[in-house]
């Protein structure tokens, strides 16, 4: 039983009480405009249950389009390039705003997409922004590849920002990275965009060309992404690195 009291309540709500603040928050996130996202997930036949749970819990901008493309049984570079070709050839999706690369062993936070979108709104000069994750194993390094201030092209792993800021780099991993769709329409870019070679992984192969054409990227160290080792290839089975 409630204690005796007289209640005079403002039914306007907390957000209405500070419309200026609410509007500024919505402007930062950009969810009031089109933020349609194609999600590309390269995978074998199965995705670990713990990883799948993190994917299911991802929040997307309300009432914006989302379509998920599962690229099964292909080498990862081929999976990305083939999926992108099919998307750009489809008039229903070719003009969407973003493409999110999400790998079968990466576990992003539930608000990760929204945070990356907010960063993209803040930094129109960047073509891609990824979440922060490390290579697997006890000696793992952050997938913040290359120092853009060095005049010599490089992909040395850079230090993360403990304060959760952006770190610009020469290339990103693809585990949880948001790209502007418009970049892939640039006819000057090499095709296939992604390809694993004897000397480069598919992501570094791609960025070696993207940067030559003026495209820039960064890692958002406030979006912390796990890297799941199901079989224990790098130590303990079912370890989240």
Predicted regions and their residues:
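Conserved catalytic core of nucleotide-sugar-dependent glycosyltransferases
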Residues: 109-195
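Short, high-confidence coil segments that cap the C-terminus of an alpha-helix
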Residues: 96, 123-126, 215
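Residues at alpha-helix caps and immediate loop-helix transition turns in enzyme cores, especially N-
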Residues: 51, 79, 112-113
């Amino acid at each position: 039983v409630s204690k005796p009291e007289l209640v005079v309540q403002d039914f306007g709500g907390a957000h209405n009480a500070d419309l200026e603040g609410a509007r500024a928050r919505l402007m930062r996130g950009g969810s009031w405009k089109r933020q349609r996202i194609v999600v590309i997930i390269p995978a074998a036949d199965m995705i670990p249950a713990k990883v799948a749970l993190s994917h299911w819990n991802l929040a997307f901008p309300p009432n914006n389009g989302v379509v998920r493309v599962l690229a099964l049984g292909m080498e990862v570079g081929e999976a990305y390039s083939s999926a992108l070709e099919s998307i750009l050839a489809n008039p229903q999706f070719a003009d969407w705003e973003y493409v999110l690369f999400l790998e079968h062993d990466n576990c992003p936070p539930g608000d990760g997409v929204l945070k990356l979108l907010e960063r993209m709104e803040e930094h129109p000069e960047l073509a891609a922004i990824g979440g922060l994750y490390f290579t697997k194993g006890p000696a793992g390094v952050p997938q913040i590849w290359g120092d853009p201030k060095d005049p010599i092209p490089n992909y040395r792993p850079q230090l993360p920002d403990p304060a959760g800021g952006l770190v610009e780099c020469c290339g990103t991993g693809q585990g949880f990275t948001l790209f502007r769709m418009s970049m892939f329409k640039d006819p000057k870019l090499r095709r296939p965009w992604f390809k694993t070679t004897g000397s480069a992984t598919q992501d570094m192969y791609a960025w070696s060309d993207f940067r030559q054409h003026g495209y820039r990227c960064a890692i958002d160290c406030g979006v912390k992404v796990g890297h799941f080792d199901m079989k224990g290839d790098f130590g303990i089975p079912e370890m989240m690195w």
